[in-house]
Amino acid sequence: MAKERGRRNLKKIKESSQSDSLKTLKADPSPSREAAQIDVNTFFGLVNSEELDYFKQAESTLNANAFENSEERQGFVSSVFEEAKGKELKLVTNQICSKLMERLILNGSDRQVKRLFKAFNGHFLSLAVHKYSSHVLETLFIRSASVIENELLNNYQEEEAEEEESDEVFATMENMFLFMLAELSSSIQKLIVHQYGSHVIRLLLLIVGARELPSSIMSNSILRSKKSKIARKMIEIKDNQDSNRAYQVPAGFKNELQELLGLIAKDKDSKQLRELAIDKIASPVIQLCIQLEGLVDKDRTIWTTIFPEVDDKDPKEEAFVEYLLSDPIGSHFFQAAIKYQKPKTVHRLYDLYIKDRLLKLAKRETTGAFVVKELLGKLKATDVTEMLDILIPHLSELIENNLEIGQAIVDASIARNNYGKEGIISQFLKVFNDANVLESVLKLSTSTLGNTKNDWPTAEERRCAIFLEKLVEYDDSFLDAVIAALLELPEDRFIQMCMHGVFSHVVESVLVIERVDIVKRRRLLNIFTEHVVTLSCNAYGSHIMDKLWQFSIKLNLFKDRIALALFENKDKIKDSIYGKLVWKNWSMELYCRRMYDWKNLIKQQELELFPDHRGAPTLLKKRPLEEPKKVEEKKDKSRGRRRYH
């Protein structure tokens, strides 16, 4: 009998073992998918044609929001609530009427929310697994969290007259909420793998965990599915002030959180929880459980069941980690899960399964690269510098199709006193040296720049712009490259960039007086001064005009030309809400009425920025017969700006 080979044969056996484990993961159907078929009644009757016409018109009226005041709107909402009384269940399960119910919840009073909550008692499970009513429940639960906080703070905003006229007696919102939790808890293991019910469970976990409740329309929201977020934008259902914030909840909600997490993990071993972690429906729920369990469980039962704390490699765990690093759903789970773990815990997984093939994983741009990016911000300094030593020499390859990994490497370098900066710069310059950096990074030729259809900037454009801004901030060589590329653009294209919702931020990022030499400042200002009015009256260009107040220091000829253009077109400037802010931030009222004071303001600005400059001009003196007036220091009038709309 032939002698078996040594290490090579062992390697084959090991690979075969891992392959079998991976096949098992891939071959298994979604966990408990058949069990997730919840047998409940979701039919509560049909809305007749007359009712449908009335409620459809009411939905349109609320959407138009053409009420003269809030009292008129509240009166209309109350009348629709009254008309819907006794019909709530069939309305929330109707496609058109469910949108109306969401609007009523968003505009209703605390008492009206309680009345609706009471109408759903005993039917929450049925509503949670229905395509339309599940969305209504999510909106209702967010409003309920607001009411619970009001009750805790004794901050009731109900009209006393309404309570006196009504004979209805309601329990506290807290008790009603707990009663609903009890109804859903019995089916929670089926709900977490249900197409609609899983979203409801995610929201409930956030509420009882006192975490921020996300927007239902933002692209990165964990509250709704992608289709739901797009649909809500199309039908113009906007969140009220209750979203995008956390609420105070009773202390007893911690016990509810602990109970919910316990029910989700009940009777589940590593294999079953791992199946849930890679299931496209259940995975976001398990991510959230891992995020929250540290609040009530020091042992972090769900995490340690999925990733047992052992010192050596485990073939099954190794196969599972490999699947996570090669699967889009799995990599998203892995990235989100390690974000909330201690560096020591994450180090074990990195050291056992990732370190030896870090570069290979970083090249998996749709899977493993996201985990590598998270590790760069999570691990200890020694691990991160080790990662940088491996990744930096190959940075030019990595960013060809994945700019985000480049940004993560730059962030990691900055966080560690610019570790490996020279290598990073040389790698980036390999890519951008022989090409226009704006085209290489922003892909201007295929972007929404210059579109006349009011296209929103794409998510890809936002990512590319943020990456380029990061490079400009990182080193002057990138700043110079971007300025050179801007100056090479046709003038109309340059101005289009200044008025673009995303690319205008890139232009703003180079307008830093301390880093740009005077020759380049003159060349840029030459272009800006020809388009003062256009930029001032634009939502994005007006921010660039604000920055030019400081960018034109010691180039007073350009500052005067800009001020003169504003003055000569003051009617048009003042008619624009954006132009008014530019007018204010350039102190144009002072320019019109007290030119000496305006000139002195400029001199003070120069002295503040260059206090040690020899031969700095002195403040202009007033006319002899006028009473001297002290020039007040210019206050910072910079206005807030959202980061990409």
Swiss-Prot record:
Span list, region Disordered: 1-33, 619-645
Molecular function GO terms recorded: mRNA binding
Keyword Nucleus (UniProt): yes
Record InterPro entries: ARM-like, ARM-type_fold, NOP9, PUM-HD, Pumilio_RNA-bd_rpt
Disulphide bond pairs: none
Any single GO CC term annotated in Swiss-Prot or TrEMBL for this entry: preribosome, small subunit precursor
BP GO annotations: endonucleolytic cleavage in 5'-ETS of tricistronic rRNA transcript (SSU-rRNA, 5.8S rRNA, LSU-rRNA); endonucleolytic cleavage in ITS1 to separate SSU-rRNA from 5.8S rRNA and LSU-rRNA from tricistronic rRNA transcript (SSU-rRNA, 5.8S rRNA, LSU-rRNA); endonucleolytic cleavage to generate mature 5'-end of SSU-rRNA from (SSU-rRNA, 5.8S rRNA, LSU-rRNA); negative regulation of gene expression; post-transcriptional regulation of gene expression; regulation of biological quality; ribosomal small subunit export from nucleus
Taxonomic superkingdom: Eukaryota
Biased composition, class Basic and acidic residues, residue ranges: 623-636
Subcellular location: Nucleus, Nucleolus
Function: RNA-binding nucleolar protein required for pre-rRNA processing. Involved in production of 18S rRNA and assembly of small ribosomal subunit.
Protein name in the entry: Nucleolar protein 9
Organism name: Komagataella phaffii (strain GS115 / ATCC 20864) (Yeast)
Gene that encodes the chain: NOP9
